[in-house]
Amino acid sequence: MPKQCRHLLQTSDLSMDEIKLLLKKASVYANDFNAVSLEVKEKIHNKIIVALFFENSTRTVSSFEIASLRLGAKMVKLNMQTSSTSKGETLIDTFKNIHAMQPDAIIMRHAFSSAPFKLVEFSQCPLINAGSGTSAHPTQALLDLLTLYQHFGSLENLKGKKIAFIGDVKNSRVANSNIKLLQRLGLEIMLCAPSSMLPSTPLIKTTHHIGEAIEFADILMSLRTQTERHNTPIFASLKDYANAYCITQKRLYDHAKNKEVVILHPGPVHRDIDIESTMLEDRRSKVLEQVKNGVAMRMAVLEFLLVD
């Protein structure tokens, strides 16, 4: 096992040239998941990847597993609810024990924002952050970028575009990673949420009114209300939240005018709470493209860390 290796804990770990390389690789895989070169297949064949997910996941863990299999690697998924952490083993000891088995890469999700940044010092294989607390989810930001790259045609065309994040921005690691990445690429950003769901970001535009966000934006990213991270209820019900912040056909008609606004959501989507059901079937919704691109981008990331 190499003594030095690359990790992906946050998007700032990547140079702009590396981001462009990942977009190029992922674009090929998005067009054809089977377009894995013989050289890559030979180098990655039978490599073992361990998934340590201490929080629930559907899209991320599944797409990493599918990405691994399509590249020819093998994934071991541990059920952390039945692991020795439930018996009192510390996170560091769990990680060290898994690492001692010499996997070729570890993919990790944890409720604590600091977890992967503390554990990386013990890792001599690539460590990929698949979501840490409210701080970072780099592969989600990269697949979202791939989706926008496909739609607008180039990074140059993305520069100067306006994106509004609507919903529980404060508790969203997806928003945090996307904001940092998209700012590097020259996009303008607005955050739309009630005060209790807005982070302290004095240099970023904010609004409490979804109509203002829609008028501002070329791209809307809806975010799930993360009630599991709230100490006290913010709205009496999710229906009350939807009345203020759901992306609906009427709101787009009233405020987007003739703009072809792109609609994104990292999932899971709360239908008719985050986005109106009819809008999820609308041509402007790229939600399923995001899911497909999750496999493609994660194939590119694994190839980048394990082969390049």
From Swiss-Prot:
Gene3D superfamilies: Aspartate/ornithine carbamoyltransferase
Residues annotated for L-aspartate binding in this entry: K87, R173, R224
Keywords, in A-Z order: Pyrimidine biosynthesis, Transferase
Pathway info: Pyrimidine metabolism; UMP biosynthesis via de novo pathway; (S)-dihydroorotate from bicarbonate: step 2/3
Transmembrane segments: none
BP GO terms, sorted: 'de novo' pyrimidine nucleobase biosynthetic process; 'de novo' UMP biosynthetic process; amino acid metabolic process
Root EC class: transferase
Binding site for carbamoyl phosphate: R59, T60, R109, H137, Q140, G267, P268
GO cellular component, one term: cytosol
Entry's Gene Ontology molecular function annotations: amino acid binding; aspartate carbamoyltransferase activity
E.C. number: 2.1.3.2
PROSITE patterns to which the protein is assigned, alphabetical: CARBAMOYLTRANSFERASE (PS00097)
Function field: Catalyzes the condensation of carbamoyl phosphate and aspartate to form carbamoyl aspartate and inorganic phosphate, the committed step in the de novo pyrimidine nucleotide biosynthesis pathway.
Family note: Belongs to the aspartate/ornithine carbamoyltransferase superfamily. ATCase family.
Subunit structure: Heterododecamer (2C3:3R2) of six catalytic PyrB chains organized as two trimers (C3), and six regulatory PyrI chains organized as three dimers (R2).
Protein name, as recorded: Aspartate carbamoyltransferase catalytic subunit
Organism in which the protein naturally occurs: Helicobacter acinonychis (strain Sheeba)
Gene for this chain: pyrB
